Amino acid sequence: MRMIIVSGRSGSGKSTALDVLEDNGFYCVDNLPAGLLPELAERALINTELAEPLLAVSIDARNLPSHLTRFPQMLSEVRLRNIQCDVLYLDADEATLLKRFSETRRRHPLSTADRSLAEAIRDETALLGPIIDLADLKINTTHLNLYQLRDALKLRLLNKPEPGTAFLIESFGFKRGMPVDADLVFDVRCLPNPYWKPELRDHSGLEQPVIDYLSVQPDVEEMFQDIFAYLNKWLPRFAASNRSYVTIAIGCTGGHHRSVYLTERLGQVLQQSLKNVQVRHRDLS
């Protein structure tokens, strides 16, 4: 049986996450009291109507504070039943959450006459502390639109063919912000930039003209070898420490050329020695 617990601050994308999971065969329960988590898991295990039990539950600030405090105990009880249970935590920066609430005109679950929306959003972080501390996967949705979030959720949660650590190697552009949910970040902006070659500007690091240009640059090759040597040595240590998810981010200026090229190469070589290696290009449209 597999269970995914979805949590996060209001406005971060939890409803979208549940929709994605439901579309992919998960039985979903929204706003489950944390104290009922072990009981729900037990009932799902003995339910003969579920050929392959896939369960997703949302636990967030709508819970009683006393239930959230007990979350670590409830999670431990679930895992003692030999259930593969992942905790997903979604978040976004405060300005983005404020904007989303302003656009939808929805009421924050913690807002009152004496508590502003900004205060409610900040208080929510403290309330969800017990869940944040135990999250296996954290996704920051600040720079993701609805479709990008759905793709990210499918990639991280549903494309994990085997148990163990799932490694995501992700290219990005610094001009759109650094991915705050990355575990390791490599800055490759010091490398020769194909953008300044008019004939290469409109191509990406996935296309042969850019590949041909970057593959003969000594600094690019040296950077690749250094990053690969580091990852090849240390990623197995991450896996040995029972990490469920590790995100490695490779950044250049725009996220179209250098970071894409290196991310593709690193993904190809690491897939030869590690299981569950995924590649994503955040800023390629």
Curated annotation (Swiss-Prot):
* Signal peptide positions on this chain: none
Example of a GO MF term: ATP binding
Matching SUPFAM superfamilies, A to Z? P-loop containing nucleoside triphosphate hydrolases (SSF52540)
Superkingdom of the source? Bacteria
Pfam families in the record, alphabetically?
A: PapZ_C, RapZ-like_N
The UniProt record lists the keyword Lipoprotein: no
Q: Does the keyword Nucleotide-binding apply?
A: yes
Identify the residues that bind ATP.
Answer: 8-15
Stored InterPro entries: P-loop_NTPase, RapZ-like, RapZ-like_N, RapZ_C
What keywords appear on the UniProt entry? ATP-binding, GTP-binding, Nucleotide-binding
Which annotated residues bind GTP?
Answer: 60-63
Please explain the role this protein plays, according to its UniProt record. Displays ATPase and GTPase activities.
Which family would the database say this protein is a member of? Belongs to the RapZ-like family.
Name of this chain's protein: Nucleotide-binding protein Psyr_4150
> Which species is listed as the source?
Pseudomonas syringae pv. syringae (strain B728a)
Q: What is the lineage of its organism?
A: Bacteria, Pseudomonadati, Pseudomonadota, Gammaproteobacteria, Pseudomonadales
